[in-house]
Amino acid sequence: MNKTNDIDQLIYLFSKLPGLGIRSARRIVLYLLQDKDVRLKSLINHLIELDKKIVKCEICGNMDTKNICHICSSEHRDKSTIAIVETVAELCAMERSGNFKGLYHVLGHNLSAASRQNPRILRLPELLKRCFVENIKEVIIATNSTLEGQTTAYFIIEYLKEHPAKISRLASGIPIGGELDYLDEGTLSAAINLRQPCE
C-alpha cells in the first residue's frame, strides 16, 4: 500500500491489527473520520487512558489496572491450579468459557520448532518458583494446537519435571492448528473438563 498521506498511514496501521486487512481497516478509519469530533476523539481519549492505567500483572502476566491482577488477588480462585496460556487473548478465552477457576501463567510468546529462541522468554523460572512457593497441585498446559504451541508445550513439560504437580493438557476437540481465542465456549469448556495428564 502506498502510504502517501496521513489517512493512508492510519489505514496501514489499523490493517496490522489481528483480523484486519486493508479493506476492514479503511472502513474503520473512514467511519472514525466521518464524525471525528465524537468517534475519533472518544477512541483517542480511551487509548490514552488505557496507556496510563493498564499494567502487566507482576505474578501471572495478565493485563489489569493493578500490579496484582483481579484474578491473582481473588479469594474465590482455586489457588492450587495454574493454566499456562500463550497470551492474554487465550486467558480471556479461558475466562469466557466460565469453566476454569484457577490461576494463570501468561507466557507472552511461544517457541518455534525451527528457531533458536531463548526459552527464558517464557518466564518459566518464575513459573517453577510459583509452583513450589504456592504449592501448586496441577499445571494445565493450555497452549494453542499449532506447531509452535505444541513445541512450547513439550518444552514446558520437560522443564516442570522436577516439580511434583500433576501436568495436564487440554483435551481433544481443539483442532490441530487451532487457537484458543477462536474456539466457542462449549468446545473450550469440554477441553478443560476432559484434559489429559501428560506422561
Curated annotation (Swiss-Prot):
GO terms for biological process: DNA recombination; DNA repair. Gene3D superfamilies: 3.40.1360.10, 6.10.250.240, RecR Domain 1 (1.10.8.420). A zinc finger (C4-type) spans 57-72. The keyword 4Fe-4S does not apply. InterPro entries: DNA_Rcmb_RecR, Rcmb_RecR, Rcmb_RecR_Znf, TOPRIM_dom, TOPRIM_RecR. Residues 80-175 form the Toprim domain. CDD domains: TOPRIM_recR. It holds the Pfam family RecR_HhH. Disulfide bonds: none annotated. Coiled coil: none annotated. May play a role in DNA repair. It seems to be involved in an RecBC-independent recombinational process of DNA repair. It may act with RecF and RecO. Belongs to the RecR family. This is Recombination protein RecR. It comes from Rickettsia typhi (strain ATCC VR-144 / Wilmington). The gene is recR.
